[in-house]
Amino acid sequence: MSAVLRSLPSHAPRTAEGVLAEVNALVGQLRARAPETERLRRMHPDNLRDLTEAGVFRLAMPTDVGGYQAGEDIVAEVLAQISRGCPSTGWMCTIMVVANVIPALLADEAADEIYATPDLRTTATIAPTGQAVPVDGAYRVTGQWTWNTAGVHSNWFAPACVVPGEEDWGLRLTLMPTAEVEHQDNWRAAGMAGTATNIAMVNDVFVPSARTILVNDLADGRYPARRYSGVPYFSRPFVMYINAGSAPALLGMARGAMDCFMQTLPTRGAITYTGWSKAAEAPLLHHQLAKAQYHLEAAEMFTSRLSALYRGVLHTPATIMERAQARAYIGHIASLSRACVNQLFEASSASHTLLAADIQRYFRDINVLHQHAAIQPNSGDEVYGRVLAGLEPNSEIV
């Protein structure tokens, strides 16, 4: 294990709380860079530098490889605050922070190889649009994945594949260096425009078996015997962590929209074609603002509940009910966060539809991310309802 980094870089904060403090100080800069992030259609280079130096991508990595192995509440708050400043940047960080856990779930030889990568940033997709053909002690992977968020900023890629002859076992996640992946610069979207969610293409890439794991095992928390086997932090169902780790980005967008609304409210003048000379004095706006705040507070509570749910399976196996709850909660947090942002946008003036107004970005971004297949509330509600009714879940993302 000599190749693995055992300590934090000299510039990094000493604690996860230190990471949060640095991120809190960056929120304003992230927001100021958001228009350029959208124009670039990828992470602003200054954001990537600042967040890397702040230690963000090490948050959930093992301590023996220079990570913080941070608690759920700290990870959630860091990711929410990044999204508060820039939703696109927050979502890319979410993907890479969560996926940087994957090597700790693999055999030691794979973990050592991947965690030896300086400034590790992993991206992943569970959409099974590739094929992994078994060869002696390995797989040869070919495929195309259309939703590789932040792939151009990563150094490892973890796509899910169908394996001929293993259909009864389900999908297999494979890990390969991003240097072996070609990205098609195709991401042009109405929202989350800066996430570099491009097509990733792989052609006959050799992946040792140690760098693979069944998606069903990730869902159930079944991992090979390894150095981290006795560490509860890395023994929980990873798919459940995807749900718990993704929710804060949605909450952060609602916080950011509230920031923008409250910053402009004191200087807003008349509500056109009404008798109100100051928007802040209008009863209608008071009702709209109260409703938005209720939605924000509810999203905060459900995000805390989801973190507590995941923390609660540190020492006891997760039940299928808990896994279904995690799947449903992220959708509910998405609905609450979107309701908050949409209410605030409705309460804003027509001038806030201009691209120079920050709130319109949160409006576009939350409505686009709400459509994400792994977040979409109707799917999560169905899974949760089935389990409540005594049926098996009908989704692999549980």
How would you describe each model-predicted region?
Residues A21-N24, G252-R255, A290-E297, G331-R338, ...:
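Generic structural signal for well-ordered, non-transmembrane alpha-helical segments
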Residues Q144-W187, A196:
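DPxDG-like acidic metal-binding loop motif
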Residues P134, W145, A160-V163, L175-T178, ...:
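Short, structured patches in soluble enzyme cores that scaffold and shape functional sites
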Residues M1-A21, A25, I397-V398:
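Basic/polar N-terminal segments that are highly enriched at the extreme N-terminus
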Residues S348-V398:
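Glycine-rich phosphate/cofactor-binding loops in nucleotide/flavin-utilizing enzymes
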Residues R31, P35-E38, E297-H332, N342-T353:
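C-terminal helix-coil-helix/basic helical segment that borders enzyme active sites and/or dimer interfaces
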Residues M43-E53, F57-S154:
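Glycine-rich flavin
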Residues G191, T197-L296:
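Glycine-rich beta->alpha junctions and the first turn(s) of the following alpha-helix
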